[in-house]
Design a protein with these regions (language model features):
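Short, surface-exposed beta-strand/strand-loop-strand elements in extracellular ectodomains
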Residues: 67-85, 151-163
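Sec-dependent signal peptide cleavage junction
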Residues: 24-41
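Beta-sandwich interaction modules
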Residues: 51, 88-104, 134, 165-184, ...
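Noncatalytic modules at the cell exterior or secretory-pathway interfaces
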Residues: 101-114, 181-193
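N-terminal secretory signal peptides that target proteins for export/translocation
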Residues: 1-9
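A glycine-anchored, Pro-Gly-centered beta-turn/N-cap motif
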Residues: 46-48, 52-60, 131, 135, ...
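Bacterial N-terminal signal peptides
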Residues: 16-26
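A short "linker-to-beta-strand initiation" element
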Residues: 116-132
Length: 202
């Protein structure tokens, strides 16, 4: 699923900013719930190469699939993040179902291979069966029951940060049957091939 991607050099500075603004309408930021939309005036960063602090501001971003079909909850987006623009130190290549979340820091190099990015606080994310969610912003903290789409096909993961992902993972499990998960305020939930998620009494 995850593959190494070399940088797509060439979209820097003003060119990246122009591309970002031009893609605002080409790639409307929609969440899993179709009635939710990104805040008006949100800048959208399409496929390309971005140096954080030059081409894109530091901060937390949501990366969405470009698929706008009714089945887009199960479509993917792919990004690669490097520690700097030399590409010598790759943090990782990440693929998300529908959308993922990532924190970007000044000097890092982001390559969006498939999908587009918007500021997470302006992305209008609402809970769904795939993607990533921050408790306290995108969903309510609490206890949830997660049911797989089909037995063994999916997984869930909890993170305390979205900088380097696996260094900050709190919990991970494959979905063979319904599971109950407690999600604390500020934690991040990732869902892949879940069939349903519902709030249950704590």
């Amino acid at each position: 699923m995850v593959r190494c991607i070399k940088g797509l050099k060439g979209i820097k500075g003003a060119g990246a900013l122009i591309l970002a603004f031009s893609l605002t309408f080409a790639y409307p930021a929609v969440s899993w719930a179709v009635e939710t939309e990104a805040s008006e005036g949100t800048v959208t960063y399409g496929p390309g190469s971005y140096v954080v602090g030059e081409d894109i501001l530091p901060g937390e971003y949501a990366v969405f699939t470009e698929d706008t079909s009714e089945q887009n909850a199960y479509s993917t987006c792919t990004i690669t993040l490097y520690k700097d623009d030399t590409d010598a130190r790759r943090i990782g290549t990440f693929q998300f179902q529908h959308h993922g979340l990532i924190s970007l820091y000044k000097g890092q190099h982001l390559v969006i291979t498939k999908g587009y990015a918007v500021e997470a606080d302006r992305a209008g994310i609402t809970p769904g069966t795939t993607g990533m969610y921050k408790a306290g912003r995108d969903m309510e903290p609490g206890t949830y029951r997660i049911t797989p789409l089909t037995s063994g096909s999916g997984y869930y993961a909890l993170y305390n940060d979205v900088r380097y992902y696996y260094d900050y993972i709190d919990e991970y499990a494959a979905l063979f049957e319904p599971v109950t998960v407690n999600i604390a305020n500020g934690q991040y939930l990732e869902l892949f091939d879940a069939g349903s998620i519902e709030r249950v009494p704590d």
